[in-house]
Regions:
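A preference for well-ordered globular domain cores
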Residues: 1-158
Length: 158
């Protein structure tokens, strides 16, 4: 897998968050993050170009972004594109995909085991990251799909 990171400046139209193209047996995935518009109406963004054999999954893309230290630059437009391209069905699935960008299931279990043995720091870090992922995922789906708002909606019906 070959990954090239660049900063694009002075684009006249807003870049598409995720672009996939194919050449022979290779997939080239271009990810545009941190899109901003200047006063002249031109766009700037961080771009990751990934060339690889086969196809990347949504989790693979999030892992690459996290590995490059760009997780904080993920925005709603990017997530909506990810949801559309990979047919992510709901809030819970998207939140899980986002969490998997940084933690594997065994790593999550390890955080819980350490907490049981008295070391709360890894679990505190995991929980903070999960909350961040939940907030991002909630931006792509109706508020009624999020766990915090389910209880609020049930109480309104009473």
């Amino acid at each position: 897998m070959n990954i090239i990171e660049t900063t694009n400046e002075a684009m006249t139209s807003e870049p598409t968050p995720i672009v996939r193209s194919y050449s022979g047996r290779k997939e080239i995935t271009t990810i545009n993050l941190n899109v901003t518009q200047n006063t002249d109406g031109e766009y700037q963004c961080q771009t990751l170009s990934i060339s690889h054999d086969g196809r990347l999954s949504a989790s693979d893309i999030i892992k690459i972004i996290s590995g490059k230290g760009l997780f904080g630059h993920i925005g709603v437009a990017f997530l909506k594109c990810l949801v559309s391209l990979f047919a992510i069905p709901d809030y819970d699935t998207l939140a899980a995909v986002l969490v998997s960008g940084r933690y594997t299931y065994p790593e999550e279990l390890s955080c819980h085991r350490k907490a049981l043995l008295g070391d709360m720091q890894p679990l505190t870090e995991l929980n903070a990251y999960v909350e961040q992922c939940k907030v991002l995922a909630a931006q792509c789906f109706d508020n009624a799909d999020t766990p915090n708002n389910e209880n609020k909606n049930e109480n309104e019906n009473e």
